[in-house]
Amino acid sequence: MALPIDPAAIDPDEYGEQQTTLAMDHDEAIERVREVCLDNGFGIAVEFSPSELLNAKVDADRDPYYVLGACNPAMADRALDATDGRIGALFPCNVIIWEEAPGQQRVYHLSIMKIARLLGLPTAADEMDDIIADTGEMVEAVFAELDAD
């Protein structure tokens, strides 16, 4: 299948890639990321462990991998308005924690707001730019705090 764009040509900043590494065990990292998200204006709307699910259902033997579905309701409400509701297909803003090695956890995030813009979902471009700036500041604060650990 030929893609209409070359993914390698897109700067990671255009889709809001953020990542860091935490030197702690997996469960501690999940708790730390949850705490930092809450401290910076995000609630956790949903969370689950794909590794536990896959290991149980298809004997995948995956290392620990966890999804925290972060959400700031005010931002989500604005984004729904700015996209005529279509951004809901991307909700929530996921923060992923996976074990790279014992005692070493990768924390990873992509901006659904920036991805929505790349996909052409916004019907209110100026408002979406404001939402991207606002949520970007919040996510940067999360990763700055995690980087300080």
Regions found by a protein language model. Name each.
Residues 1-149:
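Acidic, polar-rich N-terminal leader regions of halophilic archaeal proteins
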